[in-house]
């Protein structure tokens, strides 16, 4: 395996434990106990995924996540000891792809790393020129919104939208099922491939981030509409 995983956690015992489990799976690991050194690594090396703790000595993990997202699209998993929803929502809104609360099972974290990497690799493979023949079924156009599954690119009024693999898959699924109301449960299962939990706000926060990138009016979105108590739809 050539994938490089960044670990940033000021709790050395946790960082060391995660490092051991990931190395046992064949991953290369770059481990740091503060944000400054981690950011320097991000700019120097080609990374495949980052695992960021929320509480760091020199910068909170959410700020670190936002700084990484300014120039990089690789998956980010947040670690937090606080279970308040605001932590999870803030992390995902700033660009994280997943989160896991402490204490956690290292095997679960490893499984999530593999899941995120698989999606990211598929995303990059599909985005390579010539990786797939153009097929009308792989392209959807709705009122100035153009989305291509073969190139994994989105355009709104001819301006390209910078979206993560998760955001792309959410938008594609909603466009593909245009006119239908898709529940959070169905959307989560289709995009993440996991069982949905009632307390899970992941779908909501990714929808909010997509709307923000599409410059949608919060109260009257043009594209992704909420059907309260039911789900989301693109008409």
Residue ranges and their predicted role:
Residues 2, 46-48, 71-76, 197:
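His-Asp phosphorelay/catalytic-motif detector in bacterial-type signaling
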Residues 4, 115-168, 172-179, 185:
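Short, Lys/Arg-enriched segments at the junction into DNA-binding effector domains
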Residues 16-24:
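Charged docking surfaces used in two-component/phosphorelay signaling
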Residues 26-34, 41:
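Short hydrophobic/Thr-rich beta-strand motif most characteristic of the beta2 strand and flanking loop
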Residues 33-34, 60-63, 87:
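Acidic catalytic/metal-coordinating carboxylates
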Residues 46-51, 56:
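Active-site beta3 strand of CheY-like receiver
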Residues 66, 70, 75-141:
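Basic, amphipathic DNA-recognition helix from helix-turn-helix-like DNA-binding domains
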Residues 153-222, 227-230:
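Positively charged, aromatic-enriched patches within helix-turn-helix-type DNA-binding elements
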């Amino acid at each position: 395996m050539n994938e490089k995983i960044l670990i940033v956690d000021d709790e050395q015992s946790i960082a060391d434990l995660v490092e051991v489990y990931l190395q046992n799976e064949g991953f290369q690991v770059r481990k740091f106990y503060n944000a400054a050194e981690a950011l320097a690594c991000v700019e120097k090396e080609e990374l495949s995924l980052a695992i960021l703790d929320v509480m760091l000595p020199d910068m909170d993990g959410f700020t670190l996540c936002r700084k990484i997202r300014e120039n990089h699209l690789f998956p980010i998993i947040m670690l937090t000891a606080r279970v308040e929803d605001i932590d999870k929502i803030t992390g995902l809104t700033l660009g994280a792809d997943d989160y896991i609360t402490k204490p956690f099972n290292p095997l679960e974290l490893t499984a999530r790393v593999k899941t995120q990497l698989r999606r990211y690799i598929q995303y990059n493979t599909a985005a390579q020129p010539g990786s797939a023949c153009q097929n009308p079924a792989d392209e959807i156009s709705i009122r100035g919104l153009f989305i291509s599954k073969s190139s994994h690119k989105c355009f709104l009024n001819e301006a390209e939208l910078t979206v993560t693999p998760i955001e792309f898959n959410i938008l594609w699924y909603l466009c593909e099922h245009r006119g239908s109301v898709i529940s959070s449960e169905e959307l989560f299962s289709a995009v993440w491939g996991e069982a949905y939990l009632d307390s899970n706000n992941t779908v909501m926060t990714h929808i909010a981030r997509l709307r923000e990138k599409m410059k949608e009016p919060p109260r009257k979105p043009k594209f992704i509409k909420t059907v309260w108590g039911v789900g989301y739809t693109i008409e």
